[in-house]
């Protein structure tokens, strides 16, 4: 019988006969004792299911006989021999023994039968448990009967283990019954026919070890469902903190050891409290802002543009919001800045340190000068993190404090702005302008405790570096998304942000001494010295160092020109070619000579022009040694040598 819940009421009533299974004398004789016992249990369970949806019914006599009889066969009660109730046209074989008389249960009509297991479904659903409790006949049964029914239904090993732990001698009628019930529970839990002696021993050691743990720790470990002792040890070692109150005194026996026949009421209350209270695991050491911050040296900071510095500020503030959102009480310290300087004197990069505090975390006015931004970014970032955390598992929302005196004036105090939990969500609209001198982030209750500090630190460090570049691209697209083709192309070619932090390794080429901060670029550069060209064109056999170069070259054979100018309609097969072409329409000359101030549209033109100032002539003729500033000039010069050779080879007339 499949267990399911009703989705809609049936049109026809279901009688007890619809859910009853009958046997002939020959069939009944073929059943062994266990099968007959199972038949009796199924019939009794069907009766309980009928009663659960028809509470006014009383217990019929046949049910009592089923509960008492050890070898009951339903055909021994005698009913009319020739017909089956409700099917008079069907005749019975006269050689068969008569069927039992019509039971009062045959007249029971219910809407739909719910096949529910009281022992399994009841403890997990209060409404299902109430169905069994409302019937007086069921609630009058002795507790020992319930334990016996649990023992007769094997269930899964975990359920048997729970029943084994909850076994009480006082629920049994005598020592013999208690011993038999305990042996049956052990068989259901340990399953000696399916497990070896070593596996059974492992289960017993695991159970004893769990019983020796403190109550709260044991409750948390059991919730992780460990399968062996090694997993339990790993879980316990991962717990880095536990209060002294939860540690058992020396010499005191562990509570809740396996199969305790006598458990006091006080110990039971402690076990119930341990099941309700969540396990709080705190890190061994506080996470400081320095652990998750990305630092720059003075030279590295000078390489960053204004947009990248702005993104650095946003990501650092967002990382700080992460620390606050998980309940850390932190204090933000700053360093004095030199006049008209974007970075501190002692430490070039904006270094933000978070240390443990008992109440607040403060951002001084010099932080604003350092990061070149307003407190509004701090507000937006912290609120965003709090709202995202609330959507997952936080019951409350954090807002800014709204003081009535400040709301009436339309602006906040110029000394400080408080970030607190408030009940009025309209305070943000009334808060007015924000001053950037100081921000106080008040204590936020802990919401989530970190089990492993190292994994959290690595995750926050990685997210900080990645989001710097992602947010830069998003802001660029948001500002210039509706611009011309040139703007869109420039946005898609956003230069990757140079992710540098203290201790990072710089790649230096041993052949030419060139330095690379991106390992991918360095690997491409090494192929130039080795001559490796792994990407070969299938049409002409030409090799390339990068796959993108091969893709661009294949457009020469296919004639594909996917890049079209929106101004004149001219098409190009290379993205850089259309970028250079767009400058003819806009008149942009981004490459400027530092010596004479002359500007150029292409970087190659600037490099060629700078040779006029430096006197460099990198292209030398291998015939006569003459040098040139451009490769095209060298090619033209080499033709003069070829003409001279051809003239010498011509015969004289």
From Swiss-Prot:
Subcellular compartments: Cytoplasm; Nucleus, Nucleolus
ZnF region ranges: C2H2-type: 507-529, 535-557, 563-585, 591-613, 619-641
Compositional bias segments (type: Basic residues): 459-470, 636-653
PANTHER family: CHROMATIN-LINKED ADAPTOR FOR MSL PROTEINS, ISOFORM B, ZINC FINGER PROTEIN
Keywords tagged on the record: Cytoplasm, DNA-binding, Metal-binding, Nucleus, Repeat, Repressor, Transcription, Transcription regulation, Zinc, Zinc-finger
Residue ranges with Polar residues bias: 405-414
Function of the molecule: Probable transcription repressor. Specifically binds to the 3'-end of zinc-finger coding genes and recruiting chromatin-modifying proteins such as SETDB1 and TRIM28/KAP1, leading to transcription repression. The SETDB1-TRIM28-ZNF274 complex may play a role in recruiting ATRX to the 3'-exons of zinc-finger coding genes with atypical chromatin signatures to establish or maintain/protect H3K9me3 at these transcriptionally active regions.
Disulfide bonds: none
Assembly information from the UniProt record: Interacts with SETDB1 and TRIM28/KAP1. Interacts with ATRX. Forms a complex with ATRX, SETDB1 and TRIM28.
Family designation: Belongs to the krueppel C2H2-type zinc-finger protein family.
Superkingdom in the source lineage: Eukaryota
InterPro entries membership: KRAB, KRAB_dom_sf, SCAN_dom, SCAN_sf, Znf_C2H2_sf, Znf_C2H2_type
Protein name according to UniProt: Neurotrophin receptor-interacting factor homolog
Composition bias type Basic and acidic residues, residue spans: 389-404, 471-483
Main location, first listed in the record: cytoplasm
Name of the gene this protein is made from: ZNF274
GO cellular component terms given for this protein: cytoplasm; nucleolus
Matching PROSITE patterns: KRAB (PS50805), SCAN_BOX (PS50804), ZINC_FINGER_C2H2_1 (PS00028), ZINC_FINGER_C2H2_2 (PS50157)
Gene Ontology biological process: chromatin remodeling; negative regulation of transcription by RNA polymerase II; regulation of DNA-templated transcription; regulation of transcription by RNA polymerase II
Keyword presence, Ligase: no
Residues annotated as domain SCAN box: 161-243
Region (Disordered): 139-159, 339-359, 388-414, 448-485, 632-653
Record domain KRAB: where: 14-85, 287-360
Gene Ontology MF: a single term: zinc ion binding
Record-linked Gene3D superfamilies: 6.10.140.140, Classic Zinc Finger, DNA breaking-rejoining enzymes
